[in-house]
From Swiss-Prot:
One of its GO terms (molecular function) is D-sedoheptulose 7-phosphate isomerase activity. This is Phosphoheptose isomerase. Residues 34-191 form the SIS domain. Its EC number is 5.3.1.28. The reaction produces a racemic mixture of D-glycero-alpha-D-manno-heptose 7-phosphate and D-glycero-beta-D-manno-heptose 7-phosphate. PROSITE patterns: SIS (PS51464). The gene is gmhA. Pathway: Carbohydrate biosynthesis; D-glycero-D-manno-heptose 7-phosphate biosynthesis; D-glycero-alpha-D-manno-heptose 7-phosphate and D-glycero-beta-D-manno-heptose 7-phosphate from sedoheptulose 7-phosphate: step 1/1. One of its GO terms (biological process) is positive regulation of DNA-templated DNA replication initiation.
């Protein structure tokens, strides 16, 4: 068991190191886009299913609260938290619409929409990002495996080079933390 534990940690680290080699510059670029949007009075909308929903909520909390520095709250909304909205939309319009309809209600031109899906093929995430794109938001996808359908529709896509859901999710939350740290730094230096 001890060797298994070490192997799992090594695999997690290796995936993250491979990921950062592929995406370091894009991470900086996307952080700048998010910081500029927030500085300009726009907001970040985040969504996903299951563990990806938890990541969306976690990232939103870091932006609205604080990550490392005391600063003004930054407007970010996880579209995964209101059970009345989620169940009403799921019941009345179908589960595939639960993010699309919220995006239609809340998204404005200049906002940033982050859709998180380990497979890249979650229909509700795809539809949410498409709607955000149509409404003039910058769209960002966190995904894995081969990128899935979501890789074809987002302005910026981060594809974790793994086919294991847990490794993809571990990398997604690390990416979220890195973006929060960079965005916070950029917003504070620009204030």
């Amino acid at each position: 068991m001890l060797e298994k534990v070490k192997k799992i940690f090594r695999e997690s680290a290796e995936v993250k190191l491979a990921f950062v080699e592929l995406y370091a510059q894009q991470i900086v670029d996307v952080a700048g886009i998010i910081a500029t949007a927030l500085k300009d009075g726009n907001k970040v909308l985040l969504f996903g299913n299951g563990g990806s929903a938890a990541d969306a909520q976690h990232i939103a909390a870091e932006l609205v609260g604080r990550f490392k520095k005391e600063r003004r709250p930054l407007p970010a909304i996880a579209l995964t938290t209101d059970t009345s909205i989620l169940t009403a939309l799921g019941n009345d319009y179908g589960f595939e619409t639960i993010f699309e309809r919220q995006v239609e209600a809340l998204c404005m031109p200049g906002d940033v929409a982050i859709g998180i899906t380990t497979s890249g093929n979650s229909e509700n995430v795809i539809r949410g990002l498409k709607k955000a794109h149509d409404l003039g938001a910058t769209t960002i996808a966190f995904t894995g495996r081969n990128g899935g359908k979501v890789a074809q529709i987002a302005h910026y896509t981060f594809i974790v080079p793994s086919y294991e859901t847990q490794r993809i999710q571990e990398c997604h939350i690390t990416l979220g933390h890195v973006l929060c740290e960079l965005v916070e730094e950029m917003v504070c230096e620009r204030s």
